[in-house]
Amino acid sequence: MRFSAVAGRYARALLNVAIEKEKEEEYLRFLDLVCQIYESSRELFDNPILKPEKKISLIKEIMKSFGQEMDEFQERFLTLVFERKRQKLLRNIRDLFEYEKILSEQKVPANLSIAHSPEDEELSLLRKFVRKYALKDPVFDISIDESLIAGALVEFEGFRLDTTVQGRLKRIAREALKRGEMS
């Protein structure tokens, strides 16, 4: 996924407010909900005829129906986003907010692709591996990919650990091709 520098500025600014108010998780849930609302009615929220105030009012109403309230900083944040026509960056802002939040907690974001739902023991071993190299606790973004057959693929801070059967088969194929070229 490509991240926008503009989205990064919005994400960091909102995270700074969230940290100051000690509401990082609440603000992340707010961004999740706003993204869901926006993505479910993108045509409506991208309509240039509809004023930003009306768009925010609609979001507030929908949030209220989910039992959620918007504080003044969240409302000001959305006002900036919609007035500057940056609503298409909301998902990017949300993802960067989460990434920056992990970093602010002195943890390391790590992608974990695995062929099945990971067991606690597997996660523990993978955490130890990441901790050994990153010197920080990982926060895994787990994706299940049955094409890996078995094993896990962990990526963090430029490191890549591939213990998957699929990865091993690819290495064997590359080595066989190299040997074939050499003979």
UniProtKB/Swiss-Prot annotation:
Xref: Gene3D superfamilies: N-terminal domain of the delta subunit of the F1F0-ATP synthase
A Gene Ontology molecular function term of the record: proton-transporting ATP synthase activity, rotational mechanism
Protein localization: Cell inner membrane
One matching Pfam family: OSCP
Any single biological process term in GO: proton motive force-driven ATP synthesis
InterPro entries with a match to the protein in the record: ATP_synth_OSCP/delta_N_sf, ATPase_OSCP/dsu
Keyword vocabulary terms for this entry: ATP synthesis, Cell inner membrane, Cell membrane, CF(1), Hydrogen ion transport, Ion transport, Membrane, Transport
Membrane topology: Peripheral membrane protein
GO cellular component, one term: plasma membrane
SUPFAM superfamilies with a match to the protein in the record: N-terminal domain of the delta subunit of the F1F0-ATP synthase
NCBIfam families, sorted: ATP_synt_delta (TIGR01145), PRK13441.1 (NF009976)
Annotated function: F(1)F(0) ATP synthase produces ATP from ADP in the presence of a proton or sodium gradient. F-type ATPases consist of two structural domains, F(1) containing the extramembraneous catalytic core and F(0) containing the membrane proton channel, linked together by a central stalk and a peripheral stalk. During catalysis, ATP synthesis in the catalytic domain of F(1) is coupled via a rotary mechanism of the central stalk subunits to proton translocation. This protein is part of the stalk that links CF(0) to CF(1). It either transmits conformational changes from CF(0) to CF(1) or is implicated in proton conduction.
Assembly description: F-type ATPases have 2 components, F(1) - the catalytic core - and F(0) - the membrane proton channel. F(1) has five subunits: alpha(3), beta(3), gamma(1), delta(1), epsilon(1). F(0) has three main subunits: a(1), b(2) and c(10-14). The alpha and beta chains form an alternating ring which encloses part of the gamma chain. F(1) is attached to F(0) by a central stalk formed by the gamma and epsilon chains, while a peripheral stalk is formed by the delta and b chains.
PANTHER family: ATP SYNTHASE DELTA CHAIN
HAMAP family assigned: ATP_synth_delta_bact
Family of this protein: Belongs to the ATPase delta chain family.
Name under which the protein is recorded: ATP synthase subunit delta
Species this protein is from: Thermotoga maritima (strain ATCC 43589 / DSM 3109 / JCM 10099 / NBRC 100826 / MSB8)
Lineage, broadest ranks: Bacteria, Thermotogati, Thermotogota, Thermotogae, Thermotogales
